[in-house]
Amino acid sequence: MESVAYILILTMALAVLFFAIAFREPPRIEK
């Protein structure tokens, strides 16, 4: 159970960082 909660926390942290960077700077990432 602890591993599942740990993975959820890591995923949420990565999502927060991603959205923070994405909304802080104009999107210049081109695929």
Curated annotation (Swiss-Prot):
Segments crossing the lipid bilayer? 3-23
Where is it located? Cellular thylakoid membrane
Q: Which domain of life is it from?
A: Bacteria
Q: How does it sit in the membrane?
A: Single-pass membrane protein
Stated name of the protein: Photosystem II reaction center protein T
Subunit structure, interactors included: PSII is composed of 1 copy each of membrane proteins PsbA, PsbB, PsbC, PsbD, PsbE, PsbF, PsbH, PsbI, PsbJ, PsbK, PsbL, PsbM, PsbT, PsbX, PsbY, PsbZ, Psb30/Ycf12, peripheral proteins PsbO, CyanoQ (PsbQ), PsbU, PsbV and a large number of cofactors. It forms dimeric complexes.
Note whether Thylakoid occurs among the keywords.
yes
Which SUPFAM superfamilies does the entry mention?
A: Photosystem II reaction center protein T, PsbT
Query: What gene, per UniProt, encodes this protein?
Result: psbT
Query: Is Thylakoid there in the keyword field?
Result: yes
User: What job does this protein perform?
Assistant: Found at the monomer-monomer interface of the photosystem II (PS II) dimer, plays a role in assembly and dimerization of PSII. PSII is a light-driven water plastoquinone oxidoreductase, using light energy to abstract electrons from H(2)O, generating a proton gradient subsequently used for ATP formation.
Q: Name one GO biological process term.
A: photosynthesis
This protein's UniProt keywords: Membrane, Photosynthesis, Photosystem II, Thylakoid, Transmembrane, Transmembrane helix
| Gene Ontology CC annotations of this record | photosystem II reaction center; plasma membrane-derived thylakoid membrane
Q: Which positions make up the signal peptide?
A: none
Which Pfam families does UniProt cross-reference here? PsbT
